[in-house]
Amino acid sequence: HMRNIRTLMNEAKRAGVIKESQYPFGKGLFEIKTGIGRKKGLTKKQLKAIFDYKSGNETTNRYKDLWIFIYLCNGINPTDMLKLKFSDIVDGEICFVRQKTERTTKNRKEIRATISVQMQAVIDKWGNKPLPDNYIFPYMKGNETAIEAKAITRDVVKRINKRMKLIGEELGIGNITTYTARHSYATVLKRSGVNISYISESLGHTD
């Protein structure tokens, strides 16, 4: 709920309804606590353990691979991942616009993620036939209502999180979620000394 309030306050600040001095969020002011498993990104060693992990259960391997795809595809949001089509692949790159920003022309930014060998392996193993009109992953059909699409996404995220929680416990890493993949992508780049503005751009954050 606090995140929704912050969004409204941001809008009010932008519209000039409230002054900067009246804005309640930020360092030294009110800070929104993050949930367990969201506090920090994984280390390279932990990521390697996840990448190397093999389960005897095919379902676990499938959702682990989708988690890896999220991480490698610039920490893509699951909503955007499930909407990717083969036509979004151009010259070895996946090009997409974050659903969060696609309605606002001002903030509309195309994200490009180079398809690595591991990403291609995930697509080859769990994806649809590589035809331009096909979704890369077999969850959306294309005729879903917005509510149905949201329900499908929520279900896939739930399945990924369930399997990753088990893997995290087995590897002694703790709770791992789709959010962890996105956060870890940014953290690894940051620790490697990559420019913050580049990280924001590759995640599709708006200014």
Give the location of each predicted region:
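Basic, Lys/Arg- and aromatic-enriched nucleic-acid-binding interface segment
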Residues: 20-78, 82
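N-terminal DNA-binding recognition helix of tyrosine site-specific recombinases/integrases
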Residues: 1-24
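Short, basic (Lys/Arg/His-rich) helix/loop patches that form interaction surfaces
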Residues: 161-201, 205
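Conserved tyrosine-mediated DNA breakage-rejoining catalytic core shared by Y-recombinases
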Residues: 26-28, 83-125
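A short, basic/aromatic helix-end/turn motif that makes direct DNA contacts
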Residues: 83-88, 200-207
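Hydrophobic (often cysteine-bearing) scaffold residues that line and stabilize catalytic clefts
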Residues: 1-4, 43, 62-63, 115, ...
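Short, contiguous acidic/charged loop-to-helix segments that flank catalytic cores in large enzymes
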Residues: 55-57, 99-114, 147-156, 174-177
